[in-house]
Protein backbone atom coordinates (compact mmCIF):
# COMPACT_ATOMS: atom_id res chain seq x y z
CA UNK A 1 0.00 0.00 0.00
CA UNK A 2 1.39 3.42 -0.96
CA UNK A 3 1.36 6.59 1.10
CA UNK A 4 -1.95 8.28 1.84
CA UNK A 5 -1.55 11.48 -0.15
CA UNK A 6 -4.17 13.94 -1.27
CA UNK A 7 -2.57 14.00 -4.71
CA UNK A 8 -1.32 11.18 -6.86
CA UNK A 9 2.44 10.93 -6.82
CA UNK A 10 2.51 7.92 -9.11
CA UNK A 11 4.33 6.51 -12.09
CA UNK A 12 2.90 7.07 -15.54
CA UNK A 13 1.51 3.51 -15.47
CA UNK A 14 -0.58 4.42 -12.41
CA UNK A 15 1.54 2.51 -9.91
CA UNK A 16 1.36 4.03 -6.43
CA UNK A 17 3.85 3.87 -3.58
CA UNK A 18 7.07 5.68 -4.28
CA UNK A 19 10.38 6.47 -2.63
CA UNK A 20 12.41 9.62 -3.22
CA UNK A 21 16.19 9.27 -3.13
CA UNK A 22 18.36 12.39 -3.23
CA UNK A 23 22.12 12.66 -3.14
CA UNK A 24 23.79 16.07 -2.95
CA UNK A 25 25.06 16.96 -6.41
CA UNK A 26 23.46 13.90 -8.06
CA UNK A 27 19.78 14.83 -8.25
CA UNK A 28 16.61 13.20 -7.00
CA UNK A 29 15.28 9.88 -8.22
CA UNK A 30 11.73 8.61 -7.82
CA UNK A 31 11.52 4.82 -7.33
CA UNK A 32 8.27 2.85 -7.63
CA UNK A 33 8.10 0.54 -4.63
CA UNK A 34 6.24 -2.30 -6.33
CA UNK A 35 8.05 -2.50 -9.67
CA UNK A 36 11.37 -0.92 -8.75
CA UNK A 37 11.23 1.31 -11.83
CA UNK A 38 13.03 4.58 -11.27
CA UNK A 39 13.58 7.89 -13.01
CA UNK A 40 15.08 11.28 -12.17
CA UNK A 41 12.62 14.09 -11.44
CA UNK A 42 12.76 17.86 -11.94
CA UNK A 43 10.83 20.73 -10.33
CA UNK A 44 8.10 22.54 -12.22
CA UNK A 45 9.84 25.04 -14.47
CA UNK A 46 6.88 26.97 -15.85
CA UNK A 47 6.61 30.67 -15.06
CA UNK A 48 2.78 30.53 -15.28
CA UNK A 49 1.99 31.11 -11.61
CA UNK A 50 -1.72 30.66 -12.28
CA UNK A 51 -1.06 26.90 -12.31
CA UNK A 52 1.10 27.00 -9.19
CA UNK A 53 -0.24 26.27 -5.72
CA UNK A 54 0.81 26.33 -2.11
CA UNK A 55 1.36 23.10 -0.16
CA UNK A 56 0.40 23.40 3.49
CA UNK A 57 -0.33 21.23 6.50
CA UNK A 58 -3.82 19.87 7.02
CA UNK A 59 -3.32 20.83 10.66
CA UNK A 60 -3.56 24.62 10.28
CA UNK A 61 -2.16 25.07 13.78
CA UNK A 62 1.20 23.93 12.33
CA UNK A 63 2.27 27.38 11.28
CA UNK A 64 0.73 30.70 10.42
CA UNK A 65 -1.79 29.99 7.64
CA UNK A 66 -2.91 33.62 7.41
CA UNK A 67 0.60 34.87 6.59
CA UNK A 68 1.42 31.80 4.48
CA UNK A 69 -1.64 32.34 2.28
CA UNK A 70 -1.04 36.11 2.12
CA UNK A 71 2.48 35.49 0.83
CA UNK A 72 1.24 32.89 -1.68
CA UNK A 73 -1.34 35.37 -2.95
CA UNK A 74 1.27 38.17 -3.08
CA UNK A 75 3.42 36.08 -5.46
CA UNK A 76 0.48 35.21 -7.70
CA UNK A 77 -0.65 31.79 -6.50
CA UNK A 78 -4.40 31.59 -6.91
CA UNK A 79 -5.20 27.86 -6.91
CA UNK A 80 -6.56 26.38 -3.66
CA UNK A 81 -3.80 25.15 -1.32
CA UNK A 82 -2.76 21.50 -1.43
CA UNK A 83 -3.24 20.26 2.13
CA UNK A 84 -1.27 17.23 3.35
CA UNK A 85 0.80 16.20 6.32
CA UNK A 86 4.38 15.00 6.77
CA UNK A 87 7.22 15.54 4.34
CA UNK A 88 4.82 14.61 1.54
CA UNK A 89 4.59 18.38 0.96
CA UNK A 90 8.23 18.32 -0.13
CA UNK A 91 7.46 15.36 -2.42
CA UNK A 92 4.57 17.24 -4.04
CA UNK A 93 6.86 20.24 -4.54
CA UNK A 94 9.63 18.07 -6.04
CA UNK A 95 7.16 16.53 -8.50
CA UNK A 96 5.74 19.89 -9.56
CA UNK A 97 2.32 19.31 -7.99
CA UNK A 98 2.91 22.35 -5.79
CA UNK A 99 5.23 25.31 -6.34
CA UNK A 100 5.60 26.52 -2.79
CA UNK A 101 5.65 25.17 0.76
CA UNK A 102 5.67 27.71 3.57
CA UNK A 103 5.82 27.03 7.27
CA UNK A 104 6.02 30.18 9.34
CA UNK A 105 6.15 30.47 13.14
CA UNK A 106 2.86 29.87 14.89
CA UNK A 107 0.86 32.92 15.85
CA UNK A 108 0.57 31.41 19.35
CA UNK A 109 4.35 30.87 19.60
CA UNK A 110 6.34 33.24 17.37
CA UNK A 111 9.64 31.93 18.78
CA UNK A 112 8.86 28.30 17.79
CA UNK A 113 11.77 26.45 16.16
CA UNK A 114 11.28 23.60 13.69
CA UNK A 115 12.66 20.11 14.35
CA UNK A 116 15.32 19.01 11.87
CA UNK A 117 13.69 15.61 11.26
CA UNK A 118 10.61 17.36 9.87
CA UNK A 119 12.60 19.04 7.09
CA UNK A 120 16.09 17.59 6.42
CA UNK A 121 15.14 14.80 4.01
CA UNK A 122 12.53 16.88 2.20
CA UNK A 123 14.90 19.81 1.81
CA UNK A 124 17.52 17.82 -0.10
CA UNK A 125 14.85 16.20 -2.29
CA UNK A 126 13.60 19.66 -3.33
CA UNK A 127 17.05 21.19 -3.72
CA UNK A 128 18.25 18.34 -5.92
CA UNK A 129 15.39 18.83 -8.39
CA UNK A 130 16.32 22.50 -8.76
CA UNK A 131 14.15 23.97 -6.04
CA UNK A 132 15.27 26.13 -3.14
CA UNK A 133 14.80 25.78 0.62
CA UNK A 134 15.66 28.57 3.06
CA UNK A 135 14.19 30.22 6.10
CA UNK A 136 12.00 33.34 5.98
CA UNK A 137 15.10 35.54 5.89
CA UNK A 138 16.64 33.69 2.93
CA UNK A 139 19.24 31.89 5.06
CA UNK A 140 20.04 28.23 4.32
CA UNK A 141 18.60 25.82 6.87
CA UNK A 142 21.21 24.96 9.51
CA UNK A 143 20.86 21.24 10.23
CA UNK A 144 24.06 21.19 12.31
CA UNK A 145 22.96 23.00 15.48
CA UNK A 146 21.12 20.27 17.36
CA UNK A 147 17.65 18.81 17.04
CA UNK A 148 15.97 22.12 16.19
CA UNK A 149 16.60 24.75 13.55
CA UNK A 150 17.58 27.31 16.20
CA UNK A 151 19.42 29.51 13.69
CA UNK A 152 16.43 29.72 11.36
CA UNK A 153 13.01 31.33 11.33
CA UNK A 154 10.34 29.38 9.47
CA UNK A 155 10.63 27.49 6.18
CA UNK A 156 10.37 28.67 2.56
CA UNK A 157 10.59 25.83 0.03
CA UNK A 158 9.94 26.56 -3.61
CA UNK A 159 10.36 25.25 -7.12
CA UNK A 160 13.12 27.86 -7.43
CA UNK A 161 11.29 30.19 -9.81
CA UNK A 162 9.24 31.80 -7.03
CA UNK A 163 11.81 31.92 -4.26
CA UNK A 164 13.13 35.48 -4.57
CA UNK A 165 9.56 36.76 -5.05
CA UNK A 166 8.52 35.04 -1.81
CA UNK A 167 11.44 36.50 0.12
CA UNK A 168 10.64 39.96 -1.28
CA UNK A 169 7.00 39.57 -0.23
CA UNK A 170 8.14 38.64 3.27
CA UNK A 171 10.16 41.85 3.47
CA UNK A 172 7.04 43.92 2.72
CA UNK A 173 5.62 45.52 5.85
CA UNK A 174 2.00 45.45 4.70
CA UNK A 175 1.67 41.66 5.07
CA UNK A 176 2.44 41.57 8.78
CA UNK A 177 -0.20 43.66 10.62
CA UNK A 178 -3.03 41.29 9.70
CA UNK A 179 -1.11 38.16 10.63
CA UNK A 180 0.00 38.81 14.22
CA UNK A 181 3.65 38.03 13.61
CA UNK A 182 6.50 40.49 13.51
CA UNK A 183 9.48 40.53 11.19
Predicted features by range, described:
Residues 1-35:
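Phosphate-binding/catalytic loop of phosphoryl-transfer enzymes
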Residues 11-13, 23-26, 36-183:
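An extended, acidic
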Amino acid sequence: MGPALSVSIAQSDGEKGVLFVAVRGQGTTLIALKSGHSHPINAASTQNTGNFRLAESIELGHGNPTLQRAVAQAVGLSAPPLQMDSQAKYAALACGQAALYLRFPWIQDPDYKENIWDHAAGAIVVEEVGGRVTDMDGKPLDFFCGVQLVNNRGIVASNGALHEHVLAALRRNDLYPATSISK
